[in-house]
């Protein structure tokens, strides 16, 4: 008998949609013309993205999107340094982190503890553990002392959006 499922990494499409949803930007409208996914700040579901067979999107290729000009019964998952560089420096990730930070700091009176709790609810749909809450509050308290509230919360949001918990299904 199996008592648990092996961890699996989300496909890039589901991961992109999860980040857009956490940032409150995912456009759930049905139908319509396909659009470039990572250009012009497209926030439609990835399902509606335009795929060019001769020139697939660089971000999709980076995260194991199959060659659209050939049959691919499964994807060969890879892990590369470029993937983590995208998480740390990619314009898409930075925009999502800023948008999530805007949601978390909409109330100027929000305490670091409130921000951490709201962030975990939005990103992971759960409450943070005591350790996660303590570490998040300590980080935010130290960063907020610099007076750059939005930037501090955006960095925290980016760390959560780039975490394994969002990328993998347990």
PLM features per residue range, with description:
Residues 156:
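Globin-like tetrapyrrole-binding proteins
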Residues 110-112, 144-152:
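Short, charged, surface-exposed loops that flank catalytic or proteolytic processing sites
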Residues 1-127, 160-170:
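An acidic, gly/pro-interrupted, aromatic-rich
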Residues 115, 119, 135-136, 152:
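Amphipathic alpha-helical segments in structured regions that serve as interaction surfaces
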Residues 134-144:
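Amphipathic alpha-helical segments that form the core helices of the histone-fold
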């Amino acid at each position: 008998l199996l008592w648990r499922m092996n961890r699996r990494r989300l496909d890039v499409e589901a991961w992109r949609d999860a980040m857009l949803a956490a940032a409150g930007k995912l456009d759930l409208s049905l139908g319509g013309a396909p659009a470039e996914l990572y250009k012009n700040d497209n926030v439609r579901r990835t399902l509606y993205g335009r795929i060019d067979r001769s020139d697939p999107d660089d971000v999709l290729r980076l995260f194991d999107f199959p060659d659209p000009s050939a049959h691919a019964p499964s994807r060969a998952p890879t892990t590369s340094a470029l993937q983590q560089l995208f998480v740390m420096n990619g314009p898409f990730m930075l925009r999502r982190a800023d948008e999530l930070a805007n949601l978390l700091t909409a109330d100027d009176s929000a305490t670091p503890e409130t921000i951490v709790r709201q962030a975990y609810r939005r990103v992971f749909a759960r409450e943070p553990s005591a350790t996660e809450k303590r570490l998040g509050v300590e980080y935010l308290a130290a960063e907020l002392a610099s007076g750059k509230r939005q930037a501090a919360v955006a960095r925290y949001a980016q760390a959560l959006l780039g975490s394994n918990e969002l990328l993998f299904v347990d």
